Structures are given as structure tokens and as C-alpha cells.
């Protein structure tokens, strides 16, 4: 792009929420491109985790210390104050107050910042004020059915092992192998220490997500964790500790795709610096060996777990549910290994109908996805009816030949659910209704209420045992177990609506005046803007 940006005055950034993190090299490059330009950001989810999400986007076209937003020249101070309000509270101990402050912050941002900068359009408003235009163009929005929860029921033995494992990986495991510098006795860089602490937290979340994703993916991850611990301890006993600052910046990309195999390789291969094992506290080896024994314990616990209640429930649902039997289906999972596992098992029951696409797929596979699942594809095919995919297809690709999304993992952040369903929830779809199914772990029960209650308890166990680290699981969104379950089983989580009307109704009034009373419209045009 060097030199190309100089030829343009206007920059339009689609899926702008992908640039909420200003510490990345991509953001830095985009910031250079936008400098001195007119910038338009297009996104369905501008605010996801914290108020600073918005600030990062604003910096692409506003000077943070000298903005032109009315009565708000210093954006850094404004957003810093909002962040400070949250940092004073412990989300776990002061949950209600934390939620109140979160809502208050969102209102402040909306009233003092976004109303001056954002043009917001919801489908409800467009149907209300531009229904005639839609009709004339032969367009319509599909109805969004209430998401259907699918409960996979753990038997007594499975439930015991599942619950015990959550406790072990969330509370007992130290993740010492991923943060060696926290045990170092020599001089160190504080930023490196913090980076490794974050690494430990993210590896914890990765294991938790794997456990909920599929028993298969979890077992594979435990094997890899155990292998990397064995190698690390062997090197430590030889007097060597290898670590590097380099991998910490890249690892988040792999974690985003839940590719822990790539994370392990990155950490193991990037042995840029060697430290003498003598310069680490005795607690380091103790914790390393403790974690290794814990991994062996977990592996033994799961050795006899051959039944997969989640997969069994899914295959039965695919075979008996009329909506799933007759429509194109998109199955989302955050784990590449779960995607492969699902593909192999679903293909046994529906041979030749299943296509898999993840981060390791080739460009030709992407073309297959488009030809079979994009309703507007110029080279439409009907070779596949079921698509198993990861987050790589949650944005940027239209899949609206399908009207069904199945979330095989819990979408811990409801924003992700909206993005996934957005692939099929298009204005030009030929389907009348959009369907969503979400999986939840539960225990054997004889009623929907009992299953729902048990599922909420499972979610609560994840969030409670993770404590402050739960914010990494939900990607910063503060939710409790009941609220999360309710949001994931409501249509609002899919269409993203539920807030107050925007200014569209007033613009519609002005438009009507322009069309029907030109004299009054000329008078309005002469009115001062403020």
C-alpha cells in the first residue's frame, strides 16, 4: 500500500471492529493510511469489551488530545476516566456495581461521543421507515427465530470428571512453563513479566475452551501440554531455560484461532535467549513438576471416557430435526481439531454432504464454500449441504444460501454469536426465517427446566472458578451465568437490537418535507446547525 494511499482522499474501512487493538502492527499501518483523510468506519459491533475499543477507532480520524467533538477536546482523558471507574471495582466481588458502571460508561460514550459521529441503523428502523423502498426493490429481512438450546447430557461419571477437570485447570494448574520469568531471580524487564503472566492466563482459557468444545480436542491439548512440559523440565534439569519476548506478540493470533499446537511450536522453536537454570527460584521446578503431575492425573481421568454425549446428541439432532434435515447448515466451532473431528463423524452419517473449512484450508476450499453456500455466487454448485468451520468464516463471507447456524461451542461472547449469524442473516436471502442452535453442557434430567438449570450451573462453574480470568473467556464482556444463558437463547443476541431508536425517524420527517413541501424545506435549510 506504500504510495497508493496518497492517491485517495476517502478511506472506507469495513469490519472496523477488527482494529480495536491499537498495539498491533496492522493498526499502526492503517493509522498511517488514514492520516489526513476522510475516514468512514463500518461495523456492526463498535463497542465490545471496554470504552477504549471506541477510542482506538476514534484515533483513526480524530486527534486524541485535540478532537473536534463538541465539548470533548481531550478524548484520552475522557476514556481514561471511564476505564478508571471500572478498574476500581472487582467484577467478581462487586458484580452489580460493576455492571452499573459498565452501563453508565456505555451511556456516557453514547451521549457524549457517538451521537456526534455515528450513523446507526437497525433492521427494525429500516423496515419501519423505508418499508416501501424495500418492497419496490424486492428485498426483505428474514425473521429471526429464538435460538434453540441443545443440551448434551453427561452421565454421573462424565459429570464428575468434567467438573473435577474444570477445577484442576482453573484453580490448581500454575501454568509455570508459560511464564518462567516470573520465577527469575536476576534483572528483568517488567513488561516481559506481564507478557508472560498474560500468556499463562491465555493458556488457561485455551484449555477451558477446549474442554467445552469437545472431549476429543481437550484430550489432544492435554497431550500437547504434557509433551511440552516434559521437554521443558528435561532442559531445566540440564541447566537451561529458554524464553523469548518475540512470541508474545504473535501468540494472540494463534490463540484467536484456538490453534494451541501452533502456540506450542512457536514457544518451543523461538529459543532466542538462554537463561541459567540456577537463576530461577526453587519454586519454579516445584511448580513445573506439579503441573506435569496434574496433566498426568487429568490424562488418566479421561482415559476411559470413550462415550461422547455431545456428538451423540448432535448426530441425533441432525437426523431427526426437520429444519436441519432439509436446509443448508453452518456449524461453527472455535477449535480446528473439533472441526476436523466433527467433519469425520458427520461425514459417516451424511457421506459426501459435508465440507470443512478452517485456517489451514486452501484457497480452492474457500471457492467451494462460496459456490455452495453463497446465494449470490456466479458459479453456484450443490455438492455440499453441511459446512463445518471455525472463526475464519465468522466475518467477511456471505453464506446466506443457508438459514441455519449451529454453535457447537458456547459462544462465550454474545457479540461473536451475532457475527456468526450475520453470515446468513442478509437482506437478500430467499429464506423467510433464520434459525440458530447453541450447545450447552448439562446433566441427565427429565425436563427442559432441569436441563436448563444444570447448564446454567455448568456455565457458572466455568466463570466462578476462573475468577478475574473469566474476562478473557468472555472477551471482556461482563456477564454472569444466568445472563449469558438468557442472551444466548434470545433473538436480541442475534439481531443486535434492543437499544433506543436512532435519529432515523427525524431524517424520515425531513425527507417527507423535502418531497412534499419544498418551501418549508428551503426554510429548514437556512436554520443554523446548532
Q: Predicted regions span which residues?
A:
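SF2 helicase motor core recognition
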Residues: 49-51, 340, 381-382, 387-402, ...
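C-terminal accessory region of SF2 helicases/translocases
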Residues: 126, 429-530
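Inter-lobe connector of SF1/SF2 helicase motors
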Residues: 40, 94-290, 482-518
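Conserved helicase ATPase core of P-loop NTP-dependent helicases/translocases
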Residues: 360-389
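A short beta-strand element within the Helicase C-terminal
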Residues: 53-56, 397-409, 435-438
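Conserved P-loop NTPase motor "coupling/switch" region that bridges the ATPase
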Residues: 10, 27-128, 199-203, 433-436, ...
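Conserved helicase motor "Helicase C" RecA-like lobe of SF1/SF2 P-loop NTPases
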Residues: 334-356
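Conserved SF2 helicase motif VI
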Residues: 414-431
Amino acid at each position: 500500500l506504500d504510495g497508493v494511499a496518497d492517491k485517495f482522499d476517502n478511506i472506507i474501512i469495513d469490519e472496523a471492529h477488527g482494529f480495536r487493538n491499537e498495539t498491533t502492527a496492522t493498526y499502526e499501518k492503517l493509522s498511517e493510511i488514514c492520516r489526513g483523510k476522510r475516514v468512514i468506519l463500518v461495523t456492526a459491533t463498535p463497542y465490545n469489551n471496554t470504552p477504549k475499543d471506541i477510542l482506538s477507532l476514534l484515533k483513526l480520524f480524530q486527534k486524541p488530545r485535540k478532537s473536534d467533538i463538541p465539548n470533548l477536546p481531550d478524548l484520552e482523558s475522557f476514556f481514561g476516566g471511564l476505564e478508571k471507574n471500572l478498574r476500581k471495582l472487582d467484577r467478581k466481588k462487586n458484580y452489580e456495581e460493576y455492571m452499573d458502571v459498565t452501563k453508565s460508561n456505555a451511556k456516557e460514550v453514547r451521549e457524549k461521543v457517538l451521537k456526534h459521529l455515528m450513523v446507526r441503523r437497525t433492521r427494525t428502523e429500516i423496515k419501519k421507515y423505508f418499508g416501501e423502498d424495500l418492497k419496490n426493490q424486492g428485498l426483505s429481512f428474514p425473521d429471526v427465530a429464538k435460538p434453540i438450546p441443545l443440551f448434551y447430557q453427561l452421565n454421573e461419571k462424565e459429570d464428575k470428571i468434567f467438573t473435577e477437570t474444570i477445577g484442576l485447570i482453573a484453580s490448581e494448574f500454575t501454568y509455570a512453563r508459560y511464564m518462567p520469568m516470573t520465577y527469575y531471580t536476576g534483572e528483568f524487564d517488567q513488561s516481559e513479566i506481564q507478557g508472560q503472566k498474560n500468556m499463562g492466563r491465555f493458556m488457561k482459557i485455551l484449555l477451558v475452551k477446549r474442554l467445552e468444545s469437545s472431549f476429543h480436542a481437550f484430550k489432544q491439548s492435554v497431550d500437547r501440554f504434557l509433551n511440552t512440559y516434559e521437554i521443558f523440565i528435561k532442559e531445566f534439569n540440564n541447566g537451561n531455560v529458554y524464553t523469548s519476548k518475540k512470541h508474545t506478540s504473535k501468540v494472540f493470533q494463534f490463540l484467536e484461532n484456538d490453534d494451541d499446537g501452533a502456540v506450542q511450536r512457536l514457544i518451543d522453536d523461538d529459543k532466542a535467549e538462554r537463561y541459567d537454570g540456577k537463576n530461577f527460584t526453587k519454586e519454579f521446578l516445584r511448580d513445573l513438576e506439579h503441573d506435569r503431575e496434574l496433566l498426568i492425573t487429568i490424562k488418566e481421568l479421561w482415559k476411559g471416557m470413550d462415550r461422547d454425549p455431545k456428538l451423540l446428541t448432535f448426530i441425533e439432532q441432525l437426523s431427526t430435526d426437520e429444519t436441519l434435515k432439509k436446509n443448508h447448515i453452518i456449524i461453527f466451532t472455535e477449535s480446528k481439531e473439533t472441526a476436523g473431528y466433527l467433519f469425520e463423524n458427520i461425514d459417516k452419517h451424511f457421506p459426501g454432504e459435508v465440507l470443512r473449512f478452517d485456517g489451514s484450508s486452501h484457497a480452492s476450499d474457500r471457492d467451494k464454500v462460496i459456490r455452495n453456500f453463497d446465494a449470490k455466487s456466479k458459479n453456484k454448485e450443490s455438492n455440499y449441504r453441511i459446512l463445518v468451520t471455525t472463526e475464519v468464516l465468522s466475518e467477511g463471507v456471505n453464506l446466506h444460501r443457508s438459514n441455519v447456524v449451529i454453535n457447537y461451542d458456547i459462544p462465550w461472547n454474545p457479540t461473536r454469536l451475532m457475527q456468526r449469524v450475520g453470515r446468513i442473516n442478509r437482506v437478500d436471502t430467499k429464506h423467510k426465517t433464520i434459525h440458530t442452535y447453541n450447545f450447552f453442557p448439562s446433566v441427565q434430567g427429565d425436563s427442559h427446566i432441569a436441563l436448563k438449570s444444570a447448564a446454567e450451573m455448568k456455565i457458572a462453574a466455568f466463570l466462578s472458578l476462573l475468577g478475574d480470568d473469566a474476562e478473557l473467556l468472555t472477551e471482556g464482556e461482563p456477564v454472569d451465568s444466568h445472563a449469558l444463558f438468557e442472551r444466548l437463547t434470545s433473538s436480541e443476541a442475534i439481531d443486535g437490537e434492543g437499544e433506543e431508536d436512532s435519529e432515523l425517524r427525524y431524517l424520515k420527517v425531513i425527507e417527507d418535507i423535502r418531497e412534499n413541501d419544498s418551501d418549508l424545506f428551503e426554510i429548514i435549510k437556512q436554520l443554523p446547525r446548532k
